[in-house]
C-alpha cells in the first residue's frame, strides 16, 4: 500500500481501533467467567504471566510485520515466512471471519435488548426475563433481522476504509468506556449484603494450591490471547493502515 493512501489520521485512531478489536466478548463476557471458574485471583497469576511474556510481544510482532509488509495476512506470511507458509495468513484471516459469525449474532441480541430497554419492556420486578428471551428466540424473523442489521451497520462503518473506521471508533469507544464506568459506579453503590463485596474479594484472592493445576494455566494462556486479540491477524491488518513514521510500540 502506497504511503499517503487510506490510513489512520493519527495515533489515537489506531489505538481506538486496536482497543475495539481487543475489548470484546473475550474480555467483557469470557474473562469474568474464567476468573470465577479458576479460583478468582489465582487465575490472574497465569493470565498476567502469559499476557506479558507471550500475548503482548506477539501483538507487537504482528504490528511490526503488518507495518513492514503493507499488505494483508496472506501476503505478510508469504513475505516473512515464504510461499509455503502463506496458508498461515489465510488461516488467521479465517479465524477472524469465524469470530465475526457469532459476533453478528450476539451483537444482534444486544441491539434487541437495547430496544427492549428503551421501550420499557424490561422494567418492573414482575418481568419474566426468561420468557422474554425465549419469545425472542422463537421468532426466527426477529433473530435474523437483528443479525443482518448488525452486518449492515458494520459494512456502513468500514465501507470507506480506515478513516471511516477511525471516526466510528471514536464514538463507539467513548460509549464503551462510559458504559463500563457506569457499571462500575453502580456496582460500588450496590448493597454489599447481597455478596458483591465477596465477589470483589474473591477476584483478588490467590489460592496457591490451585496454581499447581494445569487447567488454570492453560485457561490463563488462552485468555491472554483473547484479551488483546493476539495471533488473530487483526493487528497485522490494522498495522497496514498506520503511518510508516508511527512507532510500532504504542
Language model features by range: what are they?
Residues 2-6, 33-38, 68-91, 104-162, ...:
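Inter-helical loop and helix-membrane interface segments of multi-pass membrane transporters/permeases
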Residues 6, 35-61, 88, 142, ...:
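Extracellular loop-to-transmembrane helix junctions
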Residues 1-29, 58-63, 67-79, 86-87, ...:
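Membrane-interface "cap" regions at the ends of multi-pass membrane proteins
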Residues 13, 40-47, 84-100, 166-177, ...:
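Alpha-helical transmembrane segments and their helix-start/interface "positive-inside/aromatic belt" motifs
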Amino acid at each position: 500500500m502506497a504511503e499517503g493512501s487510506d490510513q489512520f489520521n493519527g495515533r489515537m485512531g489506531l489505538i481506538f481501533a486496536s482497543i475495539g478489536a481487543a475489548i470484546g466478548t473475550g474480555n467483557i463476557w469470557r474473562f469474568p467467567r474464567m476468573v470465577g471458574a479458576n479460583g478468582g485471583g489465582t487465575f490472574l497469576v497465569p493470565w498476567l504471566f502469559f499476557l506479558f511474556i507471550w500475548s503482548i510481544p506477539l501483538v507487537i510482532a504482528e504490528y511490526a510485520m503488518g507495518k513492514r509488509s503493507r499488505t494483508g495476512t496472506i501476503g505478510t506470511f508469504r513475505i516473512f515466512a515464504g510461499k509455503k507458509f502463506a496458508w498461515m495468513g489465510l488461516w488467521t484471516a479465517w479465524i477472524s471471519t469465524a469470530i465475526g459469525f457469532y459476533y453478528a449474532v450476539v451483537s444482534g441480541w444486544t441491539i434487541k435488548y437495547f430496544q427492549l430497554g428503551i421501550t420499557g419492556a424490561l422494567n418492573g420486578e414482575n418481568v419474566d426475563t426468561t420468557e422474554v428471551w425465549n419469545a425472542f428466540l422463537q421468532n426466527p424473523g426477529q433473530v435474523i433481522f437483528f443479525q443482518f442489521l448488525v452486518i449492515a451497520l458494520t459494512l456502513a462503518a468500514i465501507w470507506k476504509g480506515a478513516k471511516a473506521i477511525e471516526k466510528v471508533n471514536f464514538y463507539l469507544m467513548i460509549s464503551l468506556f462510559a458504559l463500563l464506568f457506569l457499571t462500575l459506579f453502580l456496582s460500588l453503590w450496590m448493597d454489599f449484603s447481597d455478596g458483591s463485596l465477596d465477589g470483589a474479594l474473591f477476584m483478588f484472592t490467590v489460592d496457591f494450591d490451585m496454581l499447581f493445576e494445569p487447567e488454570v494455566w492453560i485457561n490463563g494462556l488462552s485468555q491472554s490471547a483473547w484479551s488483546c486479540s493476539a495471533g488473530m491477524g487483526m493487528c497485522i491488518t490494522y498495522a497496514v493502515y498506520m503511518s510508516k513514521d508511527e512507532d510500532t510500540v504504542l
